[in-house]
């Protein structure tokens, strides 16, 4: 997705959990959550903002829901326009020793694709990718991201800025943070041995 216009930063600041104005100064890709009014996670986003443009990649979430959600609250006074871009390729080096949130992905437009940019990397199989996502605790759409869970329950509390001021879902997030009580918590565990030993 692409947001453009002089109100881009202010609009995203009010719709997501990141401090957009602080991130804009860094000119890098960063993570943010898009929440419901009750503080449940609707989508996990990567955002890169520069000048009056914001590129948005959906890590987990439903694109039409995000488009509808954004467009329903964009008013002429916001001075922002939403566009749907062609899909891109996202390259992320992965390992099991560092959080996926600490690594910097690379976005490549299919029209700018150079063969060596792809061939320098080994592509994971679908099974390897699923195992890595489980180990890393990356929430999946329609599983962990189900309209009921909040970012703290999904291990995403570190990408919520509690000092940034008003944003969608802020009041609910403040309550979750103060209560410290989680109904659920996303965890990963591994077991070794014969399958019969785990009955």
PLM region descriptions:
Residues 1-199:
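Basic, glycine/lysine-rich polyanion-binding surfaces/domains
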């Amino acid at each position: 997705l692409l947001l453009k216009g002089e109100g881009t930063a202010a609009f995203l600041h009010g719709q997501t959990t990141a401090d957009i104005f602080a991130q804009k100064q860094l000119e890098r890709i960063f993570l943010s959550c898009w929440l419901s009014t009750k503080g449940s996670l609707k989508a996990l986003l990567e955002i890169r903002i520069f000048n009056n443009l914001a590129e948005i990649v959906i890590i987990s979430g439903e694109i039409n829901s995000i488009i509808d959600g954004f467009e329903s609250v964009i008013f002429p006074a916001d001075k922002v326009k939403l566009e749907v871009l062609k899909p891109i390729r996202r390259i992320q080096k992965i390992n099991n020793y560092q959080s996926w949130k600490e690594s910097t992905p690379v976005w490549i437009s299919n029209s700018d694709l150079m063969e060596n940019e792809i061939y320098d990397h080994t592509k994971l199989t679908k099974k390897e990718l699923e195992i890595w996502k489980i180990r890393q605790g990356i929430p999946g759409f329609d599983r962990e991201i189900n309209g009921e869970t909040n970012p703290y329950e999904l291990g995403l509390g570190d990408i919520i800025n509690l000092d940034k001021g008003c944003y969608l879902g802020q009041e609910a997030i403040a309550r979750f943070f103060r209560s410290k009580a989680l109904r659920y918590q996303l965890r990963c565990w591994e077991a070794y041995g014969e399958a019969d030993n785990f009955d």
